[in-house]
Amino acid sequence: MDLKQGSHIHLMGICGTAMASLAGLLKDRGFKVSGSDANPYPPMSTQIESLGIEIKKGYAAENLHPKPDFVIVGNVISRGNAEAIELEKLEIPFTSLPKAMGEYIIANHECINISGTHGKTTTTSLMSWLLDQL
């Protein structure tokens, strides 16, 4: 979906590490960003709020009012979730975190992706240090 600066993007599950980072990147690119999470807590909640991004506690149909232009759905959201049901009812365009990252953040850039079950933070720290040494 082609989104213009100023478009409203809502992130369901915004306090996850990757989702919070994506929220900040989207805000930096000129989008209006909001989000919801079951239990927002520091450090992610304070990081997000320091960027001027509103976090709605809990998942509820009213979190999608006023209606955002686009929604990014985190992996934590299940089909029976009240907010997910409202998302389908309102027919708001949506995507997943990985697809949003690919389309709105890393498109047309070289990228190093670090994934897996264990060791991502350590590997990312080491990779950052190595690249900084170049």
What is the predicted function of each stretch?
Residues D37, Y59, N75-I77:
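Short glycine-rich, polar/acidic loop-and-turn segments at beta strand-coil junctions
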Residues K4, L25, E49, N63-P66, ...:
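Phosphate-binding loop of NTP-binding sites
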Residues I55-Y59, T95:
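Short acidic-hydrophobic, aromatic-tinged amphipathic segments that line or gate anion-handling sites
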Residues A38-N39, A60, K99-A100:
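Short, ordered loop/turn segments at secondary-structure junctions
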Residues M44:
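Phosphate-/polyanion-interacting regions in eukaryotic proteins
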